[in-house]
């Protein structure tokens, strides 16, 4: 049953990421991968919130499987972040490479920590 939940959550997470990219990409003027940054930061915030709530006993641990591993695992994307960074390097867009590297990791980590802290405060 857990595997089915992860699969369903993953499908929904991938569709959500596709939708977010469809909203952001047409409005973008620079080569900076803004949609990937948005999904990674918001997904990290949501995962921090989920883990904080689950470890405090406010949501069932089973939610971590379908929502955390499934939905948020598919919604966020380290592989796309890596691919887009390499593509920026190949294009010689060094300014955007450094912005991408400098923002993605720290903002995602901070968002996860904020989500966890926020969830712990709810308990």
Language model features by range: what are they?
Residues 1-123:
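Membrane-interface helix-loop junctions in multi-pass transporters/channels
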């Amino acid at each position: 049953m857990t595997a089915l939940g992860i699969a369903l959550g993953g499908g929904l997470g991938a569709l959500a990421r596709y939708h977010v990219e469809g909203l952001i990409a047409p409005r973008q003027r620079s080569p900076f991968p803004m949609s990937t940054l948005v999904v990674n930061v918001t997904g990290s915030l949501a995962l921090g919130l989920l883990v904080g709530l689950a470890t405090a006993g406010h949501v069932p641990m089973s939610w971590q499987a379908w929502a955390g591993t499934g939905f948020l695992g598919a919604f966020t994307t380290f592989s796309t972040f890596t691919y887009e960074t390499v593509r920026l390097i190949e294009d010689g867009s060094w300014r955007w490479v450094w912005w991408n590297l400098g923002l993605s990791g720290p903002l995602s980590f901070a968002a996860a920590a904020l989500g966890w802290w926020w969830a712990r405060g709810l308990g």
